[in-house]
């Protein structure tokens, strides 16, 4: 009885994963899908519809992504849904959809940082933060602005650099 329930749970999980994957794939444009298919086929030497982990690394790098070895291992573990050690095109497509979403988030953070960094010197000062907060309708005291800077300023230089800004945004989401 318990075994049947476990099988049903596994089937439900697989169906949910497939639905998520289909949704992610739908967010890709036809042009993106064709570009990914082209790259995938270039490295699928024997034409069996699968690529190895090493080939995956080469494909991803050919698409201007530069993951570390650990990131590659994590990707493979995450996307090799059937656990056969090779990557089918549908699994590859899911990976690339995820990568694009992460890239979009990075771009949004860079744009947000530029809004705060008025003089474009790579740092957000207390006065720049105060200026943006006032424009957003936030009436903060000097102490509150200083406190915000202090919380985000990990290296203690009195300003917030991009890495500190990203960390702050990830924590406060």
Swiss-Prot record:
GO MF: calcium ion binding
Residues the record lists as binding Ca(2+) 4: 153, 155, 157, 159, 164
Keyword hit for Calcium: yes
Bias (Low complexity) ranges: 1-26
Amino-acid positions noted as binding Ca(2+) 3 in the UniProt annotation, renumbered to this chain: 117, 119, 121, 123, 128
EF-hand domain span: 31-66, 67-102, 104-139, 140-173
Coiled-coil regions listed: none
Region (Disordered): 1-27
Positions annotated to bind Ca(2+) 2: 80, 82, 84, 86, 91
Keywords: Calcium, Metal-binding, Repeat
A UniProt-annotated Pfam family: EF-hand_7
Gene3D superfamilies from the UniProt entry: EF-hand
Binding positions for Ca(2+) 1 per the UniProt entry: 44, 46, 48, 50, 55
Function: Potential calcium sensor.
Family statement drawn from the similarity comment of this UniProt entry: Belongs to the calmodulin family.
Protein name listed in UniProt: Calmodulin-like protein 11
């Amino acid at each position: 009885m318990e075994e049947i329930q476990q099988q049903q749970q596994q089937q439900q999980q697989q169906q949910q994963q497939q639905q998520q994957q289909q949704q992610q794939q739908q967010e890709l444009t036809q042009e993106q899908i064709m570009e990914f298919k082209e790259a995938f086929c270039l490295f699928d030497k024997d034409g069996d519809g699968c690529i190895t982990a090493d080939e995956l690394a080469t494909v991803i790098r050919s698409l201007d992504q530069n993951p570390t070895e650990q990131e590659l291992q994590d990707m493979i573990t995450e996307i090799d849904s059937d656990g056969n050690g090779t990557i089918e095109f549908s699994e590859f497509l899911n990976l690339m959809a995820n990568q694009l979403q992460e890239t979009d988030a990075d771009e949004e953070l860079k744009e947000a940082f530029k809004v705060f960094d008025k003089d474009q010197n790579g740092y957000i000062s207390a006065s720049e933060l105060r200026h943006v907060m006032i424009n957003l309708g936030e009436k903060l005291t000097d102490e509150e602005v200083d406190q915000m800077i202090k919380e985000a300023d990990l290296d203690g230089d009195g300003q917030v650099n991009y890495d500190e800004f990203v960390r702050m945004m990830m924590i406060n989401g």
